[in-house]
């Protein structure tokens, strides 16, 4: 049946900010849904609070609202836009929960809005654990023994039934949030209390443990005529007990017999029918006991998910796009498959003749004190996917694409160390982020496949594959470079060995291996992802490399530009950089260039087969990029858009004769190399905080006496502030050198005078060699010392004088010309006592580019991409800075709730995973919306606790009187209370934890506070007050760790975040009117 004509406009709910467990795969699905529905002629209204997404670009929908995904705000949008239908299956758990709230509060009924894609009942049946259990029993499928509990009392009753170990999961949460595995009563109590607190319905599911079982996922699509297809069967390499988002996964499933596959296939179709998913994609998870083959169903998601993004990229079948069309009445046989150019309908199940491996990317090094063992709560922040002709090639490509410094199965353990075996056994049994490398070490240490299986429960088939790779490495090592003949080298390349890994095994340079390959003419060929195992001709250039005979790349001789993507998401390099890469591809495609994308992140829009003309799904390493350049011969390569990943390759690419366009690699180096940069700064006569570069600890102490404390210390060349700290005295400085870094002539350490209480400012600008245009000046809300990626910011600036801003504009222009920037640049300043200090310059796309583009309506990444290929700013009509007639505030989202034990104090090391944007007529309204967007709801009044550091005591009086005016009663710790008392404000005095009971923590646990302001500096003070911040986090009390944020919060109390809604299109029209 063709599409429905009784609905004209559809509201799509996005997923909001990126958090662990819900990342940019929902930008990919939402963007696809917008495109699919608009090409069918529907009016699309989109709501998403995350500005760093492609789906919130003004061209993607008819009306785009960057507003909080909160049911009261969405009600305002429904009232204004009057959509006929709402599609909630594209925005993850956030969108489902919001849709259920709209249903519950009667909003959908009030405005006559129909839910499409999934009914409220189907969502509820799949999400509500007890209803799901009953439903599965009714169709003869077994679930793990389990029951729900709404209190600790009930939880203990369930425990008697399931026994230890048991798995605890809160209802309606995402990425296993708040869940875990309990092995004893103490852990059981801790996880249950946390889980009851985190579940929006205060309900837990307690399951028997299936630890060590095999885990599978089926991606299923069903239409309203009951046509069903399995898009992909995914097998988890890691067994049950590790969240599937943290597992290495493989597609197609490798260890199922055909009979088992058919049983599972039939079961998944039965699940969709029973739950009532009539239109769209779902993912169904199964566990199989390897001992007796008992199969249980673990859960199903009645929506597009992380796995469906992976399945789409793995097969070339666009699940989200198809699901969106099914939601408006199409059936699978009516839709044509794009990849085969319409030669096959969407009702053909994809078949694949290659192996896909996904490996998660973790960031534990950023969370000191976090438990880094993997459990049922998701902890990874990104993922990489690789495609190969066999499991071994696929795995090794994924390992090098991960960018954790591994070129393959690199050694982790020194096997001669006395505790080597103990260490390996621990790492195999208690899985951490690096288990796969320890498995290889176990084989090197002589363990058998059975020995490894007994510790890991990983299927022996996978272990044999790894064991063989380890044996091959040993043979190659023994044969030496001389023994690397044509046959051996070709065999190693077919098994996925990188040049870098071979060079490490043989002790020669990577270049020598590359020369040898050239001599033997051993080069990769490119095969196409075509959904049909080459049965039909593919129109789509979606390629992966392998060492085979026939190459299917068929390059053209058009003018081509190649964009290098950012690889897997991680903290400090996320979706913002992917956004820039997509914009580069779109802009140059519009201008008639053929665009080529190289990336290996399955979650993103950049790896969608129709974002660029040609997509190479390959690791972003020197070897892989050079191989593609050899085949495609592009006219230019863009390295400034994918963050640090491609930037690191700039010099080596240039040396290999690759045309790197935009700012030259030498200019990039002048900005990143401390000494070269200082020469430029001195030549221009600009101010920097006093600083020094040291190569030994004694030298550091001598310099620190000249500069003075506090100091910011960090190793040179880092992104996202790795190993960066603020030290307050000499003793602290010595500790840093002993614990945090190894300092040497090769790796110097930088010391900078820390400008306490300075205001930090970010500026994005574009230079074409003739003129510099400022994209936006953003004033940070958190003071200097908080990493710019973790600070909220306002555009336009909300306190800076015109004079200071003009000083910055002048300096930006000088710097751009001095460094020879062609394209984007980002500059960070600090303002203190009316002086402007230069902190750093990055001649590349920064993470603020999407936010500035949304706030001003100027697509900076597109404009700069055109500058790189030679268009001037004047030709593009972008010649002056746009200052919008409204305020936009960017606020960040932090993942501390996933890492109990980590201090949530903000500092110079970046730890946020995502961002939201709020827009308002005043700064207060914009800030209030941004806070609501990241889920902080500040109650009116109540009791506030103030405990601040020495340097903040002057300003705390002002803050206290503002809080009193807002109706708060105040508590304060001793030092703060004295200052307030002198000013005539008398707070209740409370004890610090070591001062006797009842102390602060008791009061937090009793829910006495609605707001906490706690600032601390100096090692000891930070350590002492950590319990207060952890307590606030654990008991969901709103807290701020900087005074600036506290003042901004007070201001936001004067505005109503839910009062008005404005679309991006309306905002940009206002900007244009204002310009005129």
Curated annotation (Swiss-Prot):
Binding site for Mg(2+) 4: 840, 842
One term of GO molecular function: carbamoyl-phosphate synthase (ammonia) activity
Gene Ontology CC terms, in alphabetical order: cytoplasm
Catalytic activity field: hydrogencarbonate + L-glutamine + 2 ATP + H2O = carbamoyl phosphate + L-glutamate + 2 ADP + phosphate + 2 H(+)
Ligand binding (Mn(2+) 2): 299, 301
Ligand binding (Mg(2+) 2): 299, 301
A Pfam family this chain is assigned to: MGS
Record key words, sorted: Amino-acid biosynthesis, Arginine biosynthesis, ATP-binding, Ligase, Magnesium, Manganese, Metal-binding, Nucleotide-binding, Pyrimidine biosynthesis, Repeat
Its EC number(s): 6.3.4.16, 6.3.5.5
Amino-acid positions noted as binding Mn(2+) 1 in the UniProt annotation, renumbered to this chain: 285, 299
Residues holding Mg(2+) 3: 828, 840
Pathway membership: Amino-acid biosynthesis; L-arginine biosynthesis; carbamoyl phosphate from bicarbonate: step 1/1; Pyrimidine metabolism; UMP biosynthesis via de novo pathway; (S)-dihydroorotate from bicarbonate: step 1/3
Sequence segments annotated as region (Carbamoyl phosphate synthetic domain): 554-935
S-S bridge residues: none
Subunit description: Composed of two chains; the small (or glutamine) chain promotes the hydrolysis of glutamine to ammonia, which is used by the large (or ammonia) chain to synthesize carbamoyl phosphate. Tetramer of heterodimers (alpha,beta)4.
UniProt family annotation: Belongs to the CarB family.
Function: Large subunit of the glutamine-dependent carbamoyl phosphate synthetase (CPSase). CPSase catalyzes the formation of carbamoyl phosphate from the ammonia moiety of glutamine, carbonate, and phosphate donated by ATP, constituting the first step of 2 biosynthetic pathways, one leading to arginine and/or urea and the other to pyrimidine nucleotides.
Name of the featured protein: Carbamoyl phosphate synthase large chain
Organism listed in the record: Vibrio cholerae serotype O1 (strain ATCC 39315 / El Tor Inaba N16961)
UniProt lineage: Bacteria, Pseudomonadati, Pseudomonadota, Gammaproteobacteria, Vibrionales
